[in-house]
């Protein structure tokens, strides 16, 4: 008996009135993940694209893999550099299961380590965070699907990996679980679930962490997975000493623009490599999942606002002098622009609205980075702020079109 035939045989038990009716959501999710649904329309269908929502979410999930794999590599690379500088490798192996497991699997944790050893060490930090987020979020998704008697949506594939990529590698797992609960339940399911949430769940979860547990999501001690090591992010360094203050926190060597573009700097797991993010973004833009108008709008808003601050200048705030091409490669700007701002649910729907929505994000991100003395990163708050205005932009665009058509027919 083939797998497909077995699924078809047991399906009646999960349908309304069947013995396992309450488990239909899990059955449907498994069956449609393995095979294309066998349902057909009774009349002519209007198919504009063969890419359904399930495949779209999976494609976005896969497009984040370049940033994920590089992020794991960078976490391991930064940790190895730090433990060597501190001379604490043996203490790390005896005191942290991540180092102990990597060492037991044959990883070289010295400066001569190859990419595989660095990737393995980074994976021991990233995968537990990702699995915690995925399992906790999956639990809430299944629970709400069963209570509301609808199919499980694949949107959490994207939410889970995004949230795992925008946190530091040292985040406690219980905080990851708590943030996931907030993002899924409060920011999405309370408003009706996928397609009805007005803000990005992954960003809402990170905002919850930032305001509830700032010590574990910001500061100088959370970005490198090594005990006793303290090192500021590149954005924080610029806020203190300008471009001349950009130094590798371990080696003390100057950070070049190419270092930041490739991702040879500490930071949140998936935010460091703009190059990897561009590769993934090219996939979803080519597939017409992400709106190029929003991306272009974010760039326009960022370039215009940073140029304005460059012209104004400041003798006390070095961030006024940061050019747009540094804003692009530092912090979470690239990840936010390509994968958060373009979220089709919480973004503007109309074409003109997408332009204004993107411009607002770019401008607000730079404004918060430069003017806010307490928090040099502004992309998270900028996107959440723009999420609130997305319906307003769409409303204004629609009303303007109505007025124009009325005036045309007078």
Swiss-Prot record:
Q: Which reaction does it catalyse?
A: a ubiquinone + n Na(+)(in) + NADH + H(+) = a ubiquinol + n Na(+)(out) + NAD(+)
Task: Tell me the subunit arrangement.
Answer: Composed of six subunits; NqrA, NqrB, NqrC, NqrD, NqrE and NqrF.
Q: Name one GO cellular component term.
A: plasma membrane
Q: Which cofactor does it need?
A: FMN
Which InterPro entries does this one have? NqrB (IPR010966), NqrB/RnfD (IPR004338)
Instruction: Give the organism, scientific name.
Output: Pasteurella multocida (strain Pm70)
Q: Has UniProt tagged this entry with the keyword ATP-binding?
A: no
Q: According to its UniProt entry, what is the function of this protein?
A: NQR complex catalyzes the reduction of ubiquinone-1 to ubiquinol by two successive reactions, coupled with the transport of Na(+) ions from the cytoplasm to the periplasm. NqrA to NqrE are probably involved in the second step, the conversion of ubisemiquinone to ubiquinol.
Q: What is its EC number?
A: 7.2.1.1
Keyword list (alphabetical) reads: Cell inner membrane, Cell membrane, Flavoprotein, FMN, Ion transport, Membrane, NAD, Phosphoprotein, Sodium, Sodium transport, Translocase, Transmembrane, Transmembrane helix, Transport, Ubiquinone
Subcellular localization is given as:
Cell inner membrane
Q: Which family does it belong to?
A: Belongs to the NqrB/RnfD family.
This chain's protein is named: Na(+)-translocating NADH-quinone reductase subunit B
One GO process term, biological-process aspect: transmembrane transport
Which leading EC class covers this enzyme? translocase
């Amino acid at each position: 008996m083939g797998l497909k035939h077995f699924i078809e045989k047991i399906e009646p038990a999960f349908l309304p009135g069947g013995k396992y009716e309450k488990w239909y959501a899990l059955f449907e999710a498994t069956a449609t993940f393995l095979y294309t649904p066998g349902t057909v329309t009774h009349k002519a269908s209007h198919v504009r694209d063969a890419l359904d929502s399930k495949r779209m979410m999976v494609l976005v999930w896969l497009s984040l893999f370049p940033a994920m794999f590089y992020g794991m590599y960078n976490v391991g690379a930064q940790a190895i550099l730090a433990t060597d500088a501190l001379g604490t490798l043996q203490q790390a192996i005896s005191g942290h299961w991540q180092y102990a497991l990597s060492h037991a699997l044959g990883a070289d944790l010295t400066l001569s380590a190859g990419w595989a050893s660095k990737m393995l060490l980074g994976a021991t930090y990233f995968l537990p965070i990702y699995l915690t987020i995925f399992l906790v979020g999956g639990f809430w998704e299944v629970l709400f699907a069963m209570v509301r008697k609808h199919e499980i949506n694949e949107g959490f594939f994207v939410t889970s990996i995004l949230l795992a990529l925008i946190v530091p590698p040292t985040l406690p797992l219980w905080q990851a679980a708590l943030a996931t609960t907030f993002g899924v339940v409060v920011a999405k399911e309370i408003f009706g679930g996928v397609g009805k949430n007005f803000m990005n769940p992954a960003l809402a979860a990170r905002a919850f962490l930032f305001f509830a547990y700032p010590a574990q999501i910001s500061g100088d001690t959370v970005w490198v997975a090594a005990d006793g090591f303290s090192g500021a992010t590149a954005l924080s360094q610029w806020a203190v000493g300008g471009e001349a203050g950009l130094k590798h926190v371990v080696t003390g060597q100057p950070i070049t623009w190419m270092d930041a573009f490739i991702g040879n700097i500490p930071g949140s797991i998936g935010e460091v490599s703009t190059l990897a993010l561009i590769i993934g973004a090219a996939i979803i833009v080519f597939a017409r999942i992400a709106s190029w108008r929003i991306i272009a709008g974010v760039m326009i808003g960022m370039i215009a606002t940073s140029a304005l601050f460059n012209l104004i200048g400041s003798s006390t705030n070095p961030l006024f002098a940061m050019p747009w091409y540094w804003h692009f490669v530092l912090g979470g700007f690239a990840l936010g622009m390509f994968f958060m701002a373009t979220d089709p649910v919480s973004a503007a729907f109309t074409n003109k609205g997408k332009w204004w929505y993107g411009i607002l994000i770019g401008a607000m991100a730079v404004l918060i980075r430069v003017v806010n003395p307490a928090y040099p990163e502004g992309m998270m708050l900028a996107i959440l702020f723009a999420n609130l205005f997305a319906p307003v932009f769409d409303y204004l665009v629609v009303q303007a079109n109505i007025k124009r058509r009325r005036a045309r027919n007078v």
